[in-house]
């Protein structure tokens, strides 16, 4: 086959000459007219075209191999040809159609190119593989040890026996390394003096990072969970305060909180007032429903802590570069008083105190008298120390689900009137703590706020909400009257019509709707919620504490007495409802509906 084309030759790339391609398979021959070719290899088997037979014939150029491949501006494939007998400076780019008789060279180049790509991919994989990194470290360590160890030069039977024993011991140690790590996680820390509390999310579902601990720790990767459940060395070295608590409370304080029970126990059949036999008469009877509550309750369910290894203990400064919501999986206990808290986490920050709801005695950060007392204690401590303000948030994807009705019903079966009085008194003291607190209270609502969890928000000074949060006060559905001074504050901030719609019909408000009605100050995007909150909190904490406190006093001076009176009225009504058979029946019906929904 003969093909004519105009290209830059291998001898003069700036001069255009006619190249003629012909010859047997796997050969590419170039002939330059009227120019003598440099010395090079020739092939006597090459035939010359008839029109060139009379002229002086330069030696034919033979393809040695294909060096590279590219696409030209027109999208056509070109190959970089290495000519036999010439160096790399004389390589030329040839179109694919010029190499029709050189298919074997092209196939060989494509094969080598594919193998190089596979090798490069394998190399990158090996470089990024942690197992490979460990193997390389192990190899380098062993090689260095063999080079530097003087004992490697000793030869003898005694030495061999010693080396074999040492090798067997080392192999045994390596085999037992992994089980020792897992067994170390189950060790009992009660005797070690190390006091830790690792709060976990009370919500089972795992969601995206949308605020303060929006991910459930139970569903995190084991590696990630192990990294987050660490304790700073300052915590491990602190003085034990186990004497302050009883044995049960000590175990509960140190324990983790697996969510092995549903929000309400499964009870076959409908729940009616008839099931609570004796409740309507003297409040001391029992029922199958209450037996199920007692058997399946989660109040006293605690387990030992999973354990902490020394290698995982890092200073808190090492975590400054991590997102704030990740660092909330553990609490830094800097004072002995912080160890008293089981259902909340308290962090003393620079200029403010951070209180996080992380209930172990209830589900979904619900409020019972124990949780309320701990929040009150933390607020009292913050009021007396140098904190300029308080940040209130929650661990998990739920901010607060209101009152813990399972806790209430379990205790109302003993003495309904006495227990209803105690519970109403607990709510009254809890709400009064917010009313009388002199320093600013900032709330970061990362998820749903229901019942009392929503009604206390107007008692705080600033409320920032995650866009995924929502607000609802379905008191009529609960079978109870409003609480948390919502009968006064809701009409003031959103008007009578909207307040009645929330308090009577239980309308659910989105974060944007709550912001529009004045219940929420600002709404932030879930992905940057914690960052936005912390930036603003630090700005407030940099202000003069006297100015902050006096400014709040001026805003609340005309409302304090009115709120205390409203709180007193609401608690009296709650005590009356909870002490009646109708109120108990309504609460049981609500729990039955929750069971059916679950």
From Swiss-Prot:
Modification N6-methyllysine occurs at: 135
Region (Interaction with EZH2) location: 61-309
One Gene Ontology term from the biological process aspect of the record: spermatid development
Annotated segments matching region Disordered: 1-76, 112-149, 204-226
Occurrences of domain Chromo (ranges): 61-121
EC number: 4.2.1.-
Comp. bias (Polar residues): 44-56, 122-149
EC top class named in words: lyase
Entry-annotated residues carrying N6,N6-dimethyllysine: 135
Subunit relationships: Forms multimers and multimerization is required for stable binding to chromatin. Interacts with HDAC1 and HDAC2 via its C-terminal acetyl-CoA-binding domain. Interacts with EZH2, EED, SUZ12, REST, EHMT1 and EHMT2. Part of a complex containing at least CDYL, REST, WIZ, SETB1, EHMT1 and EHMT2. Part of a complex containing at least CDYL, MIER1, MIER2, HDAC1 and HDAC2. Interacts with CHAF1A and CHAF1B; bridging the CAF-1 complex to the MCM2-7 (MCM) complex. Interacts with MCM3 and MCM5; bridging the CAF-1 complex to the MCM2-7 (MCM) complex. Recruited to Xist RNA-coated X chromosome.
Free-text domain note: The chromo domain recognizes and binds histone H3K9me3, histone H3K27me2 and histone H3K27me3. The acetyl-CoA-binding domain mediates crotonyl-coA hydratase activity. The acetyl-CoA-binding domain is required for recruitment to sites of DNA double strand breaks and for binding to poly (ADP ribose) moieties.
Protein name: Chromodomain Y-like protein
Species assigned in the record: Homo sapiens (Human)
